[in-house]
């Protein structure tokens, strides 16, 4: 039965193209787990939001990315995503430089923060826009741990200057692990199943 389900999905993918509007290797890996064939066509627009709350910023930017790519591929299903980190009401995006990465990691050390991933899935039959939030508790970090991690270069392309999959800084989380990585796989999978079943 599972093989039949996968076969049906592959047949639908031949008819209806699925596009991930992101260059993120982490999002590519997570979407691959859902067993859909897809293309990667990243958005290139400026990532500026007029929203006030971090969770709304993530949704607005995800919406903008998806719509930008959808305009060029109106017969496709397009997924746009954006991930932000919030601590004490303040937004942490990707660090501009190593100094800012250190500031972010120092601020997160020993505290609880939220990771919001906004997702927009666009198809000619409709738009699905949502944000998933995960609470993350950081361990207390020494300056050496922070500087050693920054020296790897890993923080520079990640919201909040860390990746949960490679830092070892997280004590525990409440919510979706995949969401912290940048792609709430379960919710996206539910929506795609609805779209491709029609």
Report residues per predicted region.
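Short, positively charged and aromatic/hydrophobic N-terminal segments
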Residues: 9-12
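N-terminal beta1-alpha1 ligand-phosphate binding loop
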Residues: 17-36
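Anionic-ligand binding patches
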Residues: 18, 53-198
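Cofactor-binding loop segments of dinucleotide-utilizing enzymes, especially the Rossmann-like FAD-
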Residues: 23, 43, 124
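Short loop/helix-cap segments at secondary-structure boundaries that form the rim of catalytic
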Residues: 29-33, 49-50, 71-72
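A short beta-strand-loop structural module common to alpha/beta enzyme folds
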Residues: 38-47
């Amino acid at each position: 039965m599972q093989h039949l389900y996968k076969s049906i999905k592959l047949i639908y993918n031949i008819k209806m193209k699925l596009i991930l509007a992101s260059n993120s290797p982490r999002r590519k890996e997570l979407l691959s787990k859902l067993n859909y064939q897809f293309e990667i066509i990243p958005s290139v627009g400026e990532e500026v939001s007029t929203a006030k709350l971090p969770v709304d910023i993530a949704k607005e930017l995800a919406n903008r990315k998806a719509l930008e790519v959808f305009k060029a591929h109106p017969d496709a299903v397009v997924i746009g995503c954006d991930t932000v980190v919030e601590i004490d009401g303040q937004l942490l995006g990707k660090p501009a430089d190593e100094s800012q990465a250190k500031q972010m990691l120092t601020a997160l050390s020993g505290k609880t923060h939220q990771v919001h991933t906004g997702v927009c899935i666009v198809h000619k039959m409709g738009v699905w826009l949502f944000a998933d939030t995960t609470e993350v508790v950081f361990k207390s970090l020494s300056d050496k741990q922070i500087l050693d991690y920054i020296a790897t270069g890993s923080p520079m392309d990640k919201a909040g200057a860390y990746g949960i999959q490679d830092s070892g800084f997280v004590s525990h989380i409440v919510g979706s692990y995949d969401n912290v990585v940048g792609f709430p796989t379960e919710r996206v999978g539910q929506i795609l199943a609805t779209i491709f079943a029609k």
